[in-house]
Amino acid sequence: MSCSGRSLMVVGTSSHVGKTLLVTALCRILKKAGKRVAPFKAQNMSLNAYVTPDGKEIAYAQALQAWAAGIPPAVEMNPILLKPQGNLTSQIVLNGVAVGTYRAGEYYERWFAPAWQAVKEALARLQKQYDWILCEGAGSPAEVNLKHRDLANMRVALHLGSPTWLVADIDRGGALAHVVGTLQLLEPEERALIRGIVINKFRGSRELLQPGLDWLENYTGIPVVGVLPWVDWVLPQEDSMGIAANPLLWEDRRDRAGGQALREGRLEIAVVRLPQVANFSDFDPLLAEPTVHLRWVHPGQSLGSPDVVILPGSKTTLNDLFALQKTGLAEQLRQYSGHIVGICGGLQMLGETIADPEGWEGIAGTYSGLGFLPLTTVLQPTKVTQQVQTQSRWPALAPIQGYEIHQGSTQADPSGCLPLFDRENLGWRDPTGRIWGSYLHGLFDNHLWRRQWLNWLRRQKGWDPLPELEGHYAQQREQLLERLADLWQPHLDLGLLME
């Protein structure tokens, strides 16, 4: 069955070729052209998540695309979210609600039919509201061993009868071969939908590339509709594999050019690269701060001497805590005299105990935390997903927006720690402020609070404070989205979308 609305499908020759960023750019380009446009990804596998205004959980990438389109994120934009937990298992989030944890085979056996129904219903609702649906695929559409259960790629395009663009990453090498091979592995009815080829991450002379593009168009009969320049600045990665593929993601280019001298006068913040790190988009506002040097530290590495260490969110808090203990990083943290921060799962690790009475993360039991704050956490099957508005009590009074995504409740001993916010059970600190943690994702997005905290750190070092900022990181994100659209629009043939 084919739906009636207008759509464009974007698939790729492999993962991390730039599908997400292209759909993001197209959302902003069409918005600027006065179109009502919505993003869509049937199934996303990611630990970077966001909570919609009605408390539904979707991939952060689709939230970013919604912001690019100038609309609020909605669960219809990502009806299926798979959150890997290790050992070939994932938590399944269907229509924004967690429905259980399954191995891959179990998931497809039990949930394939209801998941595909959810995809069709989500598309139907979006088509009633928007002029254009920009659909993003996942991985490659040509995985022949997975095609019978592929919910995210050409099954969506065929359902919509959607013209489709195929994206290849030329920076990896072999882009033309990847395009040709992908096309050969598609079924004839799928290949007939491919209306354009996009070459992404191009660096160099277009004149030198042109003979290859001419050959590709002649060989495939499909036009090249875009050659997109390399983007040398950061928008949020879709998942942690993007970080693994690009270990320099957080290495400030000024540092690589100028070395240690240029880091003087900047706070150094080390974020622990947990095995199941989640919601690392929390730290994009810190990355944008010119007076902050942000870096990853892996379990097993030397911690060094940063000003702050952050334990980020985790999909499997206990397993990541065990990784810190086994690799010696937990002991390094105990010997460390700087500031320690925990976000969500990182907050739970900072406490004295974490109980898993029903074995949701493995073997049932109660386990010792890092012991930095007098907190006790009990992991529970019920998942908290909600947006939050509150006010901070420390380091100064400031309005706060953010969102919670966690399974577990935490209780604090008020004789040994203080609340961070007016809202209860959202975050705590020790009496000195050296160690604190919060369940709140998006905390650093709050300009005023972030600058207050950074200035509190700077005063500890005898440095001058930074100017305080009003507003929210969303304003900087808007500038990045505008910049992306302006950069790529001249390099795309948008005739199909502007008709």
Curated annotation (Swiss-Prot):
GO terms for biological process: cobalamin biosynthetic process. GO terms for molecular function: ABC-type vitamin B12 transporter activity; ATP hydrolysis activity. Gene3D superfamilies: 3.40.50.880, P-loop containing nucleotide triphosphate hydrolases. Keywords: Cobalamin biosynthesis, Glutamine amidotransferase. The active site is at residues 344, 441. Pathway: Cofactor biosynthesis; adenosylcobalamin biosynthesis. Pfam families: CbiA, GATase_3. It comes from the Bacteria. The keyword Chaperone does not apply. NCBIfam families: cobQ, PRK00784.1. This is Cobyric acid synthase. The lineage of its organism: Bacteria, Bacillati, Cyanobacteriota, Cyanophyceae, Synechococcales. The gene is cobQ.
